[in-house]
Amino acid sequence: MKVKIDYDYENDNLLVYKEGAKSKKTLDLDDILIDFDENGDVVGIEILNASKLFNVDKYDLLKNLIKFEAVGKITKDLITLNIKLYLLRRKKEIIKESVVKGLNTIGLKEGEVVIG
């Protein structure tokens, strides 16, 4: 499935999702919501207050975001999500990264998840 990226400038929310996929469970890691399908695969990520989390201007997220990658490691108790945003400024690629950790409160299977 194709991954889509949408940014809501007014609310500063970044949404990355697999087009046409249906969410069955959502894991809330404070300002990051991760949606999973019935098989436990990631089908979407919503990042609230995205410009603050990545320390970038909202305009950059609206106009210069060219790629998104997220890799998560899930254990019985914990999920660690490494997120990278790729921005293009003056023909130069800039990578902004953030690592978010939280409790595996919805009983996800151990392993690795990837979106982007």
Swiss-Prot record:
InterPro entries: DUF2283 (IPR019270). This is Uncharacterized protein MJ0789. It comes from Methanocaldococcus jannaschii (strain ATCC 43067 / DSM 2661 / JAL-1 / JCM 10045 / NBRC 100440) (Methanococcus jannaschii).
